[in-house]
Amino acid sequence: MEDRPSADEVLLIGTVVDAFGLHGEIKVRSVTDRVDHLRHHVQTVFVGEERRPFPLQRIREPKTGVLILTLGGVTDRTMAEALRGAEVTIRECDAAPLEADEYFIHQLYGLRVVESSGAEIGIVREVLQTGANDVIVVERHGRSDTLLPMIHDVVESLDVAAGQIVVRLLPGLIDEEG
């Protein structure tokens, strides 16, 4: 049996929304756009808070955002229904390689946000996925939080290893009063 990874070693690929059919398949609301990578490079997924390992036998994507997974050991509808609501994760090391301008959402939490001048703005407290682009919620010491879009016009550099995001503030982007 495969070792269960810790919470900081996994990436979310989706949440089980229901059983699918009679033979134990599960329907997953997906948060990944790398289905081909999953299909060809991932052999094990982890399900639920306890990150129980299951062999990934088959994966289909009937429509964008929906996956149908066949997991080893889940052989009937009752077993599949028992997984409803559980998160499905993979080991981070099994994830598709990132492009130069890509990041994993969880990597942004806690990063320092600084202006290109070096002035500190705050710390990333939350990441909102809007569809068009991600937006970071920056907690500013002694001031109200501010929202910054993760777009090329604003983000000059993102260095996870250094723990910071350097931004170029466009006029009106930050409320200096709050």
Curated annotation (Swiss-Prot):
Secreted: is it a keyword of this entry? no
What is the superkingdom listed in this entry's lineage?
Answer: Bacteria
Question: What are this entry's molecular-function GO terms?
Answer: ribosome binding
SUPFAM superfamilies linked? PRC-barrel domain, Translation proteins
Query: In what residue span(s) does the PRC barrel domain sit?
Result: 100-173
Pfam families hit by this protein: PRC_RimM, RimM
- InterPro entries named among the record's database cross-references: PRC_barrel-like_sf (IPR011033), PRC_RimM (IPR056792), RimM (IPR011961), RimM_N (IPR002676), RimM_N_sf (IPR036976), Transl_B-barrel_sf (IPR009000)
Keywords attached to this Swiss-Prot or TrEMBL record, sorted alphabetically, are: Chaperone, Cytoplasm, Ribosome biogenesis, rRNA processing
Q: Which GO terms describe its cellular component?
A: cytoplasm; ribosome
Cellular compartment(s): Cytoplasm
Q: Record's family?
A: Belongs to the RimM family.
- Spell out the subunit comment: Binds ribosomal protein uS19.
**What is the role of this chain?**
An accessory protein needed during the final step in the assembly of 30S ribosomal subunit, possibly for assembly of the head region. Essential for efficient processing of 16S rRNA. May be needed both before and after RbfA during the maturation of 16S rRNA. It has affinity for free ribosomal 30S subunits but not for 70S ribosomes.
Q: What is known of its domains?
A: The PRC barrel domain binds ribosomal protein uS19.
What's this protein's name?
Ribosome maturation factor RimM
Which species expresses this protein natively? Roseiflexus castenholzii (strain DSM 13941 / HLO8)
